[in-house]
């Protein structure tokens, strides 16, 4: 874990305490609920450049109209307007609760029974159940995202992260030891987690996260970029190791503009490159274990190279605020190799039961 430059000058851990918006790293939790409700990644949806719902205006990055495409391809290309439609279908409050079961947030807005964060409520991560949550309006920490994405790598079993395994004295005697939970908790059915891994692999292999590809090793992940380039994320994983990267300034209004010569830092640029450089070393001596193919597709495999061609941009039918976080691919530029937030995943637990 890399939580800051110098603990002596500032006792603040950016990995565990910096609460910022998720950007499009929130989209996979909508997809997880979509799969949990019995829908297919091969379901077709229109991807207009602009979508207005109850006066709220949602747009794709670059005003791109993707035409009709599958949910799998919409995830790979991070299509905002399709994900707003998915959120309408599966409902924001259910997505917020499902994301919390995966390890996101300490509070659900309006939920008086939510677990309390030890920090003051005004500084606790909050997932507000609104349509914009599908595009990343929820508050998260970098460690929470690593923990939550690790649930899919672990085939649906969530493990609560901990930093200290055990404490030994000078003679090697155990003074304290984390009790752990080797079996974890099944929060999404195993077959749905396998499908999540397939879709998020396509996002790396042929989508917005392609800068994170590792030679000869399967990688799944998702990019995230918030409005006006104030936050950029990449969360990715192999079958047994997950790493979460966040870039941003202390001032949440300061933009990641002009960094390393980029007009704007997106999740697919520096965060994905940092992830790649770190994970290339971190996985070098680890077994190369592929993901388990999803059985639930019945032989239908997601085609990561097929998309519907863009069509003409539809005209909006009514005015509304323009505030969706942008999601975009980005050009590759060399980036620094900083140690991000990494979790080592335990082996899968017992056979899955119905997801919680």
Segment roles from a protein language model:
Residues 39-95, 130-133, 158, 170-202:
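Conserved catalytic neighborhood of penicillin-recognizing serine enzymes
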Residues 42-44, 107-127, 132-133, 159-165, ...:
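Surface-exposed patches in mature extracellular/periplasmic domains of secreted proteins
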Residues 1-21, 26, 73, 139-306, ...:
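A penicillin-recognizing enzyme superfamily signal
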Residues 9-29, 41-47, 69, 132-133:
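Short active-site loop at a secondary-structure junction
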Residues 56-63, 91-147, 163:
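Mid-domain, small-residue-enriched loop/turn segments at the edges of structured enzyme/sensor domains
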Residues 295-356:
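Proline/serine/threonine-rich low-complexity "mucin-like" segments in extracytoplasmic/periplasmic regions
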Residues 1-5, 35-39, 47-50, 76-80, ...:
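Glycine-rich, acidic and aromatic/proline-enriched surface loops and short helix-turn segments
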């Amino acid at each position: 874990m890399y939580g800051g430059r110098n603990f002596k000058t500032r006792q603040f851990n950016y990995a565990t305490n910096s609460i910022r918006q998720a950007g499009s790293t929130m989209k996979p939790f909508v997809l997880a609920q979509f799969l949990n409700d019995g829908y297919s990644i091969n379901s077709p949806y229109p991807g207009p450049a602009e979508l207005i719902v109850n006066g709220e205006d949602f747009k794709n990055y670059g005003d791109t109209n993707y035409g009709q495409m599958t949910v799998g391809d919409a995830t790979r290309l991070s299509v905002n307007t399709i994900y707003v439609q998915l959120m309408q279908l599966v409902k924001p409050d259910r997505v917020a609760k499902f994301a919390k079961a995966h390890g996101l947030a300490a509070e659900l807005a309006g939920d008086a029974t939510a677990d309390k964060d030890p920090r003051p409520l005004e500084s606790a991560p909050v997932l507000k159940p609104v349509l914009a949550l599908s595009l990343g309006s929820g508050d998260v920490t970098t460690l929470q995202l690593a923990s939550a994405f690790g649930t899919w790598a672990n085939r649906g079993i969530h493990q609560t992260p901990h930093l200290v395994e055990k404490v030994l004295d000078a003679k090697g005697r155990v003074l304290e030891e984390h009790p752990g939970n080797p079996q974890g908790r099944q929060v999404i059915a195993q077959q749905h987690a396998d499908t999540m891994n397939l879709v998020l692999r396509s996002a790396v292999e042929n989508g917005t996260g392609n800068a994170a590809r590792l030679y000869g090793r399967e990688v799944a992940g998702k990019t995230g970029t918030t409005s006006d380039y104030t936050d950029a994320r990449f969360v990715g994983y192999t079958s047994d190791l997950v790493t979460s990267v966040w870039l941003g300034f202390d001032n949440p209004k300061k933009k990641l503009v002009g960094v390393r010569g980029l007009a704007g830092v997106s999740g697919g640029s520096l965060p994905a490159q940092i992830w790649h450089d770190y994970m290339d070393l971190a996985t070098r001596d680890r077994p190369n274990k592929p993901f388990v193919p999803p059985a639930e597709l019945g032989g239908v495999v997601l085609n990561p190279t097929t998309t519907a061609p863009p069509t003409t941009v539809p005209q909006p039918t009514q005015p509304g605020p323009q505030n969706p976080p942008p999601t975009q691919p980005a050009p590759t530029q060399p980036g620094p190799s900083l140690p991000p937030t990494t979790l080592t995943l335990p082996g899968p637990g017992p056979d899955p039961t119905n997801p919680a």
